[in-house]
Every structure is written in C-alpha cells, then in structure tokens.
UniProtKB/Swiss-Prot annotation:
It catalyses: RNA(n) + a ribonucleoside 5'-triphosphate = RNA(n+1) + diphosphate. The gene is rpoB. DNA-dependent RNA polymerase catalyzes the transcription of DNA into RNA using the four ribonucleoside triphosphates as substrates. It comes from the Bacteria. PANTHER family: DNA-DIRECTED RNA POLYMERASE I SUBUNIT 2 (PTHR20856). Coiled coil: none annotated. Its EC number is 2.7.7.6. The keyword Transcription applies. Belongs to the RNA polymerase beta chain family. NCBIfam families: PRK00405.1, rpoB. SUPFAM superfamilies: beta and beta-prime subunits of DNA dependent RNA-polymerase. This is DNA-directed RNA polymerase subunit beta.
Length: 1342
C-alpha cells in the first residue's frame, strides 16, 4: 500500500486477513445526496423542488379564463455563512426565487387564444441549506434531520393470525397504501364475506366498490368465477366436465361415460381417477337431476314469451326453477363453479349481503359512509368517489408504490400511472381471494423490501408541497376575483404559508433533532440514524415486538447491534457501514459477484427484494489465490435462512466482515467475542464519550478510526495537494501543486481553524494543526485535528494501564479504582463551555438597561464588570457572581405627600428599578472566554459593543490583509518566473518594487500575454479584497435582527475545566461501565516488578457473567502494543542506528498469519523511519477489524516480540505493604472513556425552595431546585428500624406540613432547635378526594 507523507507519521498495524475489496464509502452521503437531490435543478422533474412545483402548477382559475404557470426557480446566496449564523442565532438559508408566468385567455375567442402573458420572478421564502457536514443551522443551533423508515406505498396482503375472532379462524386482508391519498382495505369476515374499508372507516360489502365502478352482478360473477354448463336433453341432465375440478370430492353418483364406470358412487375421486378421465378425453357426463339443486346461476334467465326474469344472476337453483327454465326453452344453464377446497363462493356470498343493486345506490352508500349526516346528491356522490382513487390531485401511488404494486401482483412492467385503475382494484381482490383459497402467501411487513427510507430531501419536498397546496387555494381565489389586467404574479403569491410549512418542518418536526455533538462519532451516528417513529411512522406505545426485532433482511443494511435501550429499542436503528439507498428509497448492500465459481471484484448492490433469490456466501469464506472456494460445502444465506450449499451454487459473496454492523459497532475491537447486549451498550456509550484535553489514539482499534474522524468533518482536510507554506494555531496555508491548480489562480489554499467553540452538548470544539512548515501534503490528508482526534484518527478516550483484581472493596459492583496519576497527568480532564445570555427587553414601564449602576449591590460584586456593566474576558467567576448588570423598571409605588414633596424639590429618579442581572448559576464556576453583544437596529451601542466591533473589524482586516499578502506572494512568484523566462535579469528585478514589475514590457509576445493576464489577476485580487473587506465591515457594523421587543442581547461564554473525580462515569468499549469510587494515591496502587504502578483497577467479577470477553483480549493486545512501543523507546534512548530500528519495526509489522497489510519500510527515508519511531514509542497502534481480528496465537507472538509473558499475566505487589499478591494478575492496556454523566452536573442539594401547588410537597429534580423523594420503600426502612421521630419529621416538617416548616425555619434562625409537627397537606388532599367520592369524612377533635 502507498502511504502519503502525512500517513507515514503513524501507521496502524492491521491484523485483518480478508482483502479490502471496497473502501468504506463516504459516511454522510445519505444526508448530503438526499438534500442535493432536493435543491438541484432536475430537468426531468422527478424529485426535489422541481417536482413539487410541477405537481401544483399550473394553477387555473375556476372559470378557466386564466392560469398561473411555473417556469423555473433559482436559489440565491445566503446572507451569512454558517459560523455567523451560529453566533447570531439565525437560520442558515437561501432565498428561493421562482419565475412564474400569468397567462390570460380571451373570453369570447375560441379556447386557448391568449390575450396577455406576464412573466415575473417571485420571492417564495427561505429554504434552509445543509452545511458541508450534513447538518442544518436553525435559529443558530445545529440540527440533524433523521431519516425515517416507513412502510413503502404499494399493496400488502396480510392476515390477523387468527387473533380477531374467538374461533381462531385466520382472516385475510389486503391494503393498498398510496404515497398520499386514501387507504383502501379489503378484508374477510368470519363468515367469509369480503368487505372493503376506505380510510379505516366502517366496512361495506366489497362488491359495492365494483358496482360503483359500473359493474353489473353478471359482470362481477364473470370476473371472479369459472363456469360449469349443464345441458337439458330429452329430460336428461348433462354436465360439461373438467376432470381436474373433481379432485378431492366424493362421488354422489356413478361417474360413467361411453358405458364405462370410472368412479363408483360414494368413492373419493383421486388423482388416478382424474388421469383416467383425461386420458379417455371424457368432457361430458350425465348427472342426476338432484345434482343441480343448490348450484348458483351465473347470469339472468328471462322467459322469452313474457319477458319476466325466471331467475336472476347469483340465485340458487331448485328443481322448480329447473322445470320452469326447461319449459321456457333454455336448454343450457351456466352455473358458478365453487367448492370448499380451493374455489370458495366468497364474492357470490358477498353479493347476497350487498344492499345496493346499481351504480347510483353504491355511490350513495359510499358517500354516506365517508360523510355521515350529509344529504347525498348524485353529483356529490360521483365526485367523491372519483376523487378518492382516480384523481391525480388527491391520490398518488408514486413510482415506488406503482413498482411495489405491480411486483406484488406479478405484473411484468414496473412503471405506470400514480392513480388506481379498475383492473388494479379487481386484481387485488382476485389475489386476496386466491390467498384465502390457499394459493399464495401473505407478505411479511417487517421485511426491508416492504419498508423504505425517507431522507431529508424527500421530507422537505413533501413539506414544501404542503405549503404550495395552501398557496394554490389562495391563488385560485385571486385569479377568479379581480381585475387581472393590473395584477402581476407577485400579487398572487403570498410566501408566508410556504415559509411557515418549511420552518415548521425544520424547527419542530419530530425528526428534526438537536444534533448530538458530544464527539465526532456521535455526530456521524446521529446523521446515519434511521427512525421508525415520526409523522407517518409508528408510535412507541403501539409498536409491537415484531417491528422492533432483528429481521434477516437487516443483514448489511441496518445494524443489529446499535439501538437505544429503553422504550425506543428496535425503533431507532443505525445504517450499516456499506449500506446505501437506491432510487426507490430501499436500502441496498454491496456483494461481490461470483462468476463460474470464481469470486470477482465486481460489486453489485442488492436490495432486500432482490437479495432473497440468491445464494450468498459470507465474507470470511476461505478462498485460494485465484478466488476459488477452498471447501466443497459453504455456509450461505438464501431466502433469509443460513444453510450449507455446494460451491457451484454460490452466486454472490459478502464484501467485508464489517458489512453487518454500523459505524459505532465497527469501532469495537474483538466485537465477535462480546455478548450482543453488552456490545449494544458499548456502541451506545462510545457516543457519550467527552473529548479529553489531549486526545490519545486507541492502541487497539479496528481500522475504522481514520474514516470516522475524516468523514465527521471535525478535522481540517486538504482539498488539494501541495506544501505547507505557513502554519499557526488558527490557520494553515498550503501552496498548491502545479498540476492541481485551476488556470489563472494564485494557487494558495487557506484553512482557518475553529478555536475553543461551544458544541451543542457544551463540550469544547478546538482544532490543532498536525502538519509542520514545509511538509508535503496530499489531497485528503488531515491538516488539523479536531476534538477527539489524534493525527487524523478518532480518539474518544485514553489508553490506561488496567489490572483485573479486587482491591479492598473499592471496585465492588462495577466501581472503578483510579490512580492519582491519572488526575495529575490530566488524562481525563475535559473542557466544558457554557453560554449564558442576558436579554434586555422593552417593558411596559420602560426599557431594561444594561449598566454597572445596580441598586443595593456592593463594590465587590461589581469588581469584575467594566463600565458598561459587562464582565471582562478572562475573569474567574463562581456561582452567584454578576456577569451582566441589568436593571428593570419597577411599577410606580404609591408615595406619601412628604415623599412627593421631597421628590419635587430634589428631582430624584422618577421611578424605581430592580436588579435583574445575569448571574452565574449555582454550582458553576469557570473563566469568561468570550463576550458578544447584539444590539437592535436603531438602538445606540454601548461602549463595550463598540469595542467588540472595533476588535472584530481589526481582526477581519488583519485576516484579509494576511490572506491578500499570501495570495500576492504566490502571484508575484509566478510573475517573477514569467519575467525571468522573458529575459529580464533577477538582480535587476529584485531592485525594482514589486508593483513596477507589471509595467515592464517583454519582447516575447506569448510571455507578454501571460504577464498581462497575471496583471489582470492582480487587479481582480485587489478588487476582490476591497469587496470582501467592505462586506465584512457591513456585516459587523450593521444592527442585529432581534426578536420583537428585544433591545440587546449579551452572550457570555464560560469555560470550565473538569478533572476526573469520584462519582464520574467511565466505560470501556465493550459495555463495561462503572463509576469511580476512589482516587487512590500513586504509592498505594499495585505495581509490577519494574515498579510501574497500574492506573486503574477493575473488578474481574464484572467479566464472566456479562460475557464481554473482548475486553480481556483488548487488554492483552494493548499490553503487547505497549511492549513494542517500550522497546522502540529504549532503542531511541540508546540512540541506536536507524537500520536496527527499521528492522525491528518491520518485524513488528510483518507479524501475523497472512495479514492483508504490507508495510515496506525500505521505501521510507531514514527521517521518515525516525519520525514513525517517535510516534510509535508510546505503543504501536493496532487494528483488529470486526469479525476478522487478531487470533490468540498472534496476540501471543506479539507479546513475545515485546518481551512480555505470553499468559498476559504478571506478578503485582501491594503498594501499601510491598507484599506480593498471591497469584498473577491480568495487566494490560484498555481504552477507557469518560462519559458525559459527570457528578458535577448531577450533584445537588436543597435547602428551602419551591413547592408543588396542590400537595405542597417540594418539587423534584435539579432544574427545579427540588428535593429527594422519600418514597414508600424508604418509609418501610425507617419503620423497620423503629426510627419514629426521624420518620415523623420526614413526613411532616421536611415535606408538606406548611405551618410546621415555616415555624421550624423561624426557630432555626432564632437558634432554637425545636420542632412541632402539624398536619401534612397531603392528608387534607386525601380528605378532599374522599369527599369528592360523596363520603363525608371529618376529623373528630379530642
């Protein structure tokens, strides 16, 4: 493998055996591609904004005399960039401008004669834009739109599994689900009649819908039944015979033909009899007259002479009717062929319960069901039925729906109309009847072929369409009303409903979620999340076990591991690593094609629908060098089941071993050795890891760390290759390679880094450069590390030296004992940034004022404020300190005449003010790192705001000037080379000022042209600089657009450094979580023979019952990796020559059985080897991919290479006594995470505070400054101890005895520690409740 200069700094040793056929795809593509489809111009008009416009426009007036047509749309440029939107608290969006055409037709002239056409561009609101990382900035906060897994439109056949009716009879049903429009259900009842429901209303006999489509009884019977024809000849009855139809019946008479008896009376007719009859071509037999009684006629029979109906279609025949038919000359009678086995008489039976007999009565019946209480008219009834399923405005199956519908009914074509046809409805009924008759199977609704993904773009399009439909009504009204000659398109359109619909979706939809920004992994996982909840999806309460369960079709599409614990389990899933959606929105996963028994590198993406038919081998199947299967029998998947197949039968093979799992689960090394429940916890807890002060790459990883770090967007990645020309903490400048430049540009890329910014979860986002001056970089190299990344690899925690042993009960029940060294080295120290805002409003009594002049506040409290009343940057503040001084006008108090007089004389302040300053919340302390002031337009800016503005202007100017200088330098370097090539001497040039270079003339015409082009570029560059500076200045100095009634907002940012402490929650990556019980002095920790103490002591009893053995293997492999690092470190310290280092490192990389990674250090320069060694001395990072990881043998070999015992266990000594522990202990390196459940955030104590209104008990929870609930069980505990007085005060004065508690408070203030319990308020509530039941309960006095 070829490594770039940056990648050579640290190479992770890979233990994977299977070759990587397919690189991990870009992990955010599901979000970005979907939104791109939504906003890009689509000439086909299949999806996105274009489709929404085309589906609503043209809008015609009611009279048809005019229409508003859609021409095209364009998105403008956003006003602010992403960072500015976040600071200002506004939405990152672009204005949508639509070109519309108003066409007015002549009234009197023939149809379609145009009188007037007006075209105009109309503003239609703002469309939020997606940032490069797949998020939206809505009102200044980053949000993610989660994809939804919903039931695909189409037709589904299902059964109630015998649960509905007491008899346990299985009732079948069919449901046609459109993309939008009314649902149509067909269902059988226990009597086997077929019913229809529209939109889950009350049911009607299914034949009503056929009658409404203008079918007569006879036509209905023709559609669903085969015929049996009886003929009357010479008073004898003959029947046309189809032998197959007799199968399984018992002969009620001798079946004979041509004098030969085939079946005797009373015998069961078998397949042998049928073959005999078919062989002799018997197609007509004589039957006794009684046989026809009870058969059902297939059409109306009319007496030719009188014209009266002898028997109507669907009537049962009797011998009397037969005689009348015979008399009136009907010699052949058509009857319906039915039997109990596989040709039920369902439709015939349903027709008997159907109260309607013609189209009108059927339409009226449907109208009554849909609109009960309204009087039906013919027109209304017809319109309603037409609009239900046959109107493109009201009903749409969508392309997906039509495809699924046609597939379900085994039709050839997959495309067709979005509305239903008569044939569609009849075919669904036929298939349902076939299923009831035992032919065909019901669908599995949890199959991923029946559930599809709705991503951002599609949901936004639907919302946008909703807005357009609201506008459509208004436009129709306007087109019909007024004087069209004076109106323009923009007078027709009101953009409010559209922006409201879009805003509501992005701001408050259930699927628009506040981004989880704990660390890069939680961001990526959130964007790849797939939820079954949300509008048009399931609800938590109603979702059963089946929907939540893992389904065979999840393989390679949805992760079986990563899902939340709790009520949402199984409803919220994560996309698998390689999964993607196809054009229809179904999830597909890649497979390698097997051609003629050879596994090729050709990749096919298959959806769950297509996958079932193939035989698919697993990724770890053994192949030889040519790609043939080694074994004869191979474990494969087929139709969702695993079984053994011959190697010739295999058609596809998995792409990778980690294909099954999601990104989160693919980061757990040795996942294959962990129990599923613990792996689930591990995957979920990695997302809660807080970025530590110094990121530390995991010694034992899986090889996915780089992909996650780069794709998450927290790192700064090189867009083009080049050389690092300048680097400092806040910017990196790259001089781009010649071959990657665009013609006519300076060839400089500038990357500005994010410094100490607050994330959504109050953690710290900070980027640090990881390249040095003069280093070559290639496209895609990581230039700067973000939070939780280390040299471009994800680094969520720290590598800790752990020992598995009990230690004085301090690690009882998953507690964790930590060494003080961990605190001293700041291994788990994290920075948290809080934003506190102070809003100054315009009140009825006057404006609130931000000032340092606050009533009744001492000097000390104001010591940290400047003259504007705002805290200065760098101040150390603690709970209760004032950050922003603010006073609010108080209502006029009634003054006494004397006061009025004094006021009149001395002209004191007319009204009073009260202190409403922004203070630091209790329990919070930190350093002020930034202050921002936003002032409304037209309100005078205070001194601090002007200072901030001045500083921002200076910074902007400095940044832009530096940028210009860098670009100029690049440009003049090129000008110089052109001039020198044109024959001008370098010495002369360097004596001239640079600006004069452009005035020089060259003899060579081509060179002169180049020079002129460069001069033009120089002018453009300066003009661009002025323009940028102007725009920046305007943005900084303009007033801010604040909410109504708000004059000023001051935002103060506090940074808090939190060290690890007892009560904090920590975890490994295998679901092994615990709480820190004690921070132990270094000298008391167990140490080994070299005197190295361990950092963390874990309880060995936490492993066996939980079956997450992965952590033990990780510990051993971590030890080996560290051992190799230690040896490299020793060699570096002894300053051994590079050749020895090269040899040892090469040996380490080569270790392992047939691993796929080939690192050839002979291609590295000495300098590169030394730098690699420097980066490896803390431990050699190792990748052990999921399901393809290091084997036990390889771990032992690596331990041996690091001169460590192959058992992975060493002798430890007790730090307090120096005695040896009696047996060896497993010691190694485990990657530990500090989770965002910090004791500082949870610690809370209540003195006195707010009480609940009714019960008068203290509120609960930290946010309400509440108390701890002393519940039922706690009361039992005190009762068991007989602690009567403690119990009494718990239930009275400490809770809801109102008088008692006030008296007690007074007593404590007076220094008198006595209490008198009274009547608890909750007892009074109980009395009231009993009285409300009509029982008068009274307390008797003594």
């Amino acid at each position: 493998m070829v490594y770039s200069y940056t990648e050579k700094k640290r190479i992770r040793k890979d233990f994977g055996k299977r070759p990587q056929v397919l690189d991990v795809p870009y992990l955010l593509s599901i979000q970005l591609d979907s939104f791109q489809k939504f906003i890009e111009q689509d000439p086909e008009g299949q999806n996105g904004l274009e489709a929404a416009f085309r589906s609503v426009f043209p809008i015609q007036s009611y009279s048809g005399s005019s229409e508003l047509q859609y021409v095209s749309y364009r998105l403008g440029e956003p006003v602010f960039d992403v960072k500015e939107c976040q600071i200002r608290g506004v939405t990152y969006s672009a204005p949508l401008r639509v070109k519309l055409r108003l066409v007015i037709y002549e009234r009197e002239a023939p149809e379609g004669t145009v009188k007037d056409i007006k075209e105009q561009e109309v503003y239609m609101g703002e469309i939020p834009l997606m940032t490069d990382n797949g998020t939206f900035v809505i009102n200044g906060t980053e949000r993610v739109i989660v994809s939804q897994l919903h039931r695909s439109p189409g037709v589904f056949f299902d059964s109630d599994k015998g649960k509905t009716h007491s008899s346990g009879k299985v009732l079948y049903n069919a449901r046609i689900i459109p993309y939008r429009g009314s649902w149509l259900d067909f269902e059988f009842d226990p009597k086997d009649n077929l019913f229809v429901r529209i939109d889950r209303r009350r049911k009607l006999p299914a034949t009503i819908i056929l009658r409404a489509m203008n079918y007569s009884t006879e036509e209905i019977l023709n559609l669903f039944f085969s015929k049996t024809i009886f003929e009357i000849r010479d008073n004898r009855l003959q029947m046309t015979l189809v032998p197959e139809r007799l199968r399984g019946e018992t002969a009620s008479f001798d079946i004979e033909a041509n004098g030969k008896v085939y079946v005797e009376k009373g015998r069961r007719i078998t397949a042998r009899h049928i073959r005999q009859l078919e062989k002799d071509e018997v197609n007509r037999i004589e039957v006794p007259v009684e046989y026809i009684a009870g058969k059902v006629v297939a059409r109306d029979y009319i007496d030719v002479n009188t014209g009266e109906i002898i028997c109507a279609a669907n009537m049962e025949l009797s011998l009397d009717l037969l005689a009348r038919l015979s008399q009136s000359g009907h010699k052949s009678i058509e009857t319906l062929f039915t039997n109990d086995l596989d040709h039920g008489a369902y439709i015939s039976e349903t027709l008997r319960v159907d109260p309607t007999n013609d189209r009108l009565s059927a339409l009226v019946e449907i109208y009554r069901m849909m609109r009960p209480g309204e009087p039906p008219t013919r027109e209304a009834a017809e319109n309603l039925f037409e609009n239900l399923f046959f109107s493109e405005d009201r009903y749409d199956l969508s392309a997906v729906g039509r495809m699924k519908f046609n597939r379900s009914l085994s039709r050839e074509e997959v495309e067709g109309s979005g509305i239903l046809s008569k044939d569609d409805i009849i075919d669904v009924m036929k298939k349902l009847i076939d299923i009831r008759n035992g032919k065909g199977e019901v669908d599995d609704i949890d199959h991923l072929g029946n559930r599809r993904i709705r991503s951002v773009g599609e949901m936004a399009e639907n919302q946008f369409r909703v807005g357009l439909v609201r506008v459509e009504r208004a436009v129709k009204e306007r087109l019909s009303l007024g004087d069209l000659d004076t109106l323009m398109p923009q007078d027709m359109i009101n953009a409010k409903p559209i922006s409201a619909a879009v805003k509501e979706f992005f701001g408050s939809s259930q699927l628009s979620q506040f981004m989880d920004q704990n660390n890069p992994l939680s961001e990526i996982t959130h964007k790849r999340r797939i939820s079954a909840l949300g509008p048009g999806g399931l609800t938590r309460e109603r979702a059963g076990f089946e929907v939540r369960d893992v389904h065979p079709t999840h393989y390679g599409r949805v992760c079986p591991i990563e899902t939340p614990e709790g009520p949402n389990i199984g409803l919220i899933n994560s996309l698998s690593v390689y999964a993607q959606t196809n054009e229809y929105g179904f999830l597909e996963t890649p497979y390698r094609l097997v051609r003629d028994g050879v596994v090729t590198d050709e990749i096919h993406y298959l959806s769950a629908i297509e996958e079932g038919n193939f035989v698919i081998a697993q990724a770890n199947t053994v192949l030889d060098d040519e790609g043939h299967f080694v074994e004869d029998l191979i474990t494969c998947r087929n139709y969702g089941e695993s079984s053994l197949f011959n190697r010739e039968q295999v058609e596809y093979m998995d792409v990778s071993t980690q294909q099954v799992v999601s990104v989160g689960a693919s980061l757990i090394p040795f996942l294959e050795h962990d129990d599923a429940n613990r792996a689930l916890m591990g995957a979920n807890m990695q997302r809660q890891a807080v970025p530590t002060l110094r990121a530390d790459k995991p010694l034992v990883g899986t090889g996915m760390e780089r992909a996650v770090a780069v794709d998450s967007g927290v790192t700064s990645v090189a867009k083009r290759g080049g050389v690092v020309q300048y680097v400092d903490a806040s910017r990196i400048v790259i001089k781009v390679n010649e071959d990657e430049m665009y013609p006519g540009e300076a060839g400089i890329d500038i990357y500005n880094l994010t410094k100490y910014t607050r994330s959504n979860q109050n953690t710290c986002i900070n980027q640090m450069p990881c390249v040095s001056l003069g280093e070559p970089v290639e496209r895609g190299d990581v230039l700067a590390d973000g939070p939780s990344t280390d040299l471009g690899e994800l680094a969520l925690g720290q590598n800790m030296r752990v020992a598995f042993m009990p230690w004085n009960g301090y690690n009882f029940e998953d507690s964790i004992l930590v060494s003080e060294r961990v605190v001293q080295e700041d291994r788990f120290t994290t920075i948290h940034i809080q934003e506190l805002a102070c809003v100054s409003r315009d009140t009825k009594l006057g404006p609130e004022e931000i000032t340092a002049d606050i009533p009744n506040v001492g000097e000390a409290a104001l010591s940290k404020l400047d003259e504007s009343g705002i805290v200065y940057i760098g101040a150390e503040v603690t709970g209760g300190d004032i950050l922003v001084g603010k006073v609010t006008p108080k209502g006029e108090t009634q003054l006494t005449p004397e006061e009025k007089l004094l006021r009149a004389i001395f002209g004191e302040k007319a009204s009073d003010v009260k202190d409403s300053s922004l203070r630091v919340p209790n329990g919070v302390s930190g350093t002020v790192i930034d202050v921002q002031v936003f002032t409304r337009d037209g309100v005078e800016k205070d001194k601090r705001a002007l200072e901030i503005e001045e500083m921002q202007l200076r910074q902007a100017k400095k940044d832009l000037t530096e940028e210009l200088q860098i670009f100029e330098a690049g440009l003049f370097a090129r000008i110089r080379s052109v001039l020198i090539a044109g024959g001008i001497e370098a010495e002369k040039l360097d004596k001239l000022p640079r600006e004069r270079w452009l005035e020089l003339g060259l003899a060579d015409e081509e060179k002169q042209n180049q020079l002129e082009q460069l001069a033009e570029q120089y002018d453009e560059l300066k003009a661009e600089f002025e323009k940028k500076l102007d725009a920046k200045r305007r943005k900084i100095t303009q007033g801010d657009d604040l909410a109504p009634g708000v004059l000023k907002i001051v935002k103060v940012y506090l940074a808090v450094k939190r060290q690890i402490q007892p009560g904090d929650k920590m975890a490994g990556r295998h679901g092994n979580k615990g709480v820190i019980s004690k921070i132990n002095p270094i000298e008391d920790m167990p140490y080994d023979e070299n005197g190295t103490p361990v950092d963390i002591v874990l309880n060995p009893l936490g492993v066996p019952s939980r079956m997450n053995i992965g952590q033990i293997l990780e510990t051993h492999l971590g030890m080996a990796a560290k051992g190799i690092g230690d040896k490299i470190n020793a060699m570096l310290k002894q300053q051994q020559e590079v050749a020895k280092l090269r040899e040892f490192i090469q040996k380490a990389y080569n270790l392992g059985d047939e691993t796929r990674q080939k690192v050839d250090l002979s291609t590295f320069s000495d300098e590169e080897v030394m730098r690699l060694a420097e980066n490896l001395k803390k431990g050699m990072p190792i990748a052990t991919p999921v399901f393809d990881g290091a084997k036990e043998k390889e771990i032992k070999e690596l331990l041996k290479l690091g001169d460590l015992p192959t058992s992975g266990q060493i002798t430890l000594f007790d730090g307090r006594t120096g005695e040896q522990f009696e047996r060896q202990v497993t010691v190694g390196y485990m990657y530990m995470l500090k989770l965002n459940h910090l004791v500082d955030d949870k610690m809370h104590a209540r003195s006195t505070g707010s009480y609940s209104l009714v019960t008068q008990q203290p509120l609960g929870g930290k946010a309400q400054f509440g108390g701890q609930r002393f519940g039922e069980m706690e009361v039992w505990a005190l009762e068991a101890y007989g602690a009567a007085y403690t119990l009494q005060e718990m239930l009275t004065v400490k809770s809801d005895d109102v008088n008692g508690r006030t008296k007690m408070y007074k007593n404590i203030v007076d220094g008198n520690h006595q209490m008198e319990p009274g009547m608890p308020e909750s007892f009074n509530v109980l009395l009231k409740e009993i009285r409300s039941l009509g029982i008068n309960i009274e307390l008797e006095g003594e």
